[in-house]
Swiss-Prot record:
SUPFAM superfamilies: Delta-sleep-inducing peptide immunoreactive peptide. The gene is bun. It comes from the Eukaryota. This is Protein bunched, class 1/class 3/D/E isoforms. GO terms for molecular function: protein homodimerization activity.
Length: 219
């Protein structure tokens, strides 16, 4: 591999590349990577030739300038492509916004509300709202339990008052099922209880009178 032909981008001169051009520097074997770099420099920049350190540095600087220029060209091309793409997207957005405004102005209000409702239903539910619901239920549950306990206590007091009231033994507070037969039976039982109480009072009065007669009047 002694020579190879190639063409420079700046001119059409055919260059012979000597791969064994820099076998060593100051009696030491050259780095393989540096050798490859130097070969590419000789291929693309044939004007900067020589074996001195200054010539090598010049070639490296020229190679770096060449790389920078290629990178700048590539970046500019990419920027132009991105600008075109952004411009196309902006035009599309403007067109869609115009179509949306036209549709909103011509669509019935009911249909628009239905669409908004469908969008709300299709949207994922909010996680904080779901997490807050059990807390509300836990607050409502003790309140409901407290109300139930209060109602039970009030019912117990009412039942106790009915059981201890003398009038409750005479007159019933309610008539089951609202029928005439049940009403008459309740009245009859109340009358019987009244008669029994009258008899008890009469017998007690007679007993007291007999005691007074037997013992005589008190002086």
């Amino acid at each position: 591999m002694k020579t190879e032909t190639g063409s420079n981008n700046n001119n059409t001169t055919v260059v012979n590349m000597d791969f064994d051009m820099y076998p060593s520097i100051s009696g030491k074997q050259q780095d393989p990577v540096r050798e490859v770099v130097m070969k590419y420099i000789d291929y693309f920049l044939p004007d900067a030739s020589g074996t001195s350190a200054v010539a090598i540095d010049n070639k490296i600087e020229q190679a770096m300038d060449l790389v920078k220029s290629h990178l700048m060209i590539a970046v500019r091309e990419e920027v132009e492509v991105l600008k075109e793409r952004i411009s196309e997207l902006m035009d599309k957005i403007n067109k869609l916004e115009l179509e949306n405004s036209i549709l909103k102005s011509n669509i019935p209000q009911e249909t628009l509300q239905q669409l908004q409702l469908q969008l709300q239903l299709a949207a994922p539910p909010a996680t904080p709202a779901i997490q807050a619901a059990p807390a509300v239920q836990s607050v409502v549950a003790p309140a409901a339990a407290g109300q139930a306990v209060q109602q039970q206590a009030a019912g117990a007091v009412a039942v106790t008052g009915v059981a201890t009231s003398p009038a409750s033994a005479v007159v019933p507070t309610s008539i089951p099922n609202g029928s005439a037969e049940n009403g008459s039976s309740a009245v009859e039982s109340a009358a019987v209880s009244v008669e029994q109480q009258v008899q008890q009072v009469t017998s007690a009065a007679a007993a007291a009178a007999s005691v007074v007669t037997a013992n005589g009047p008190m002086s």
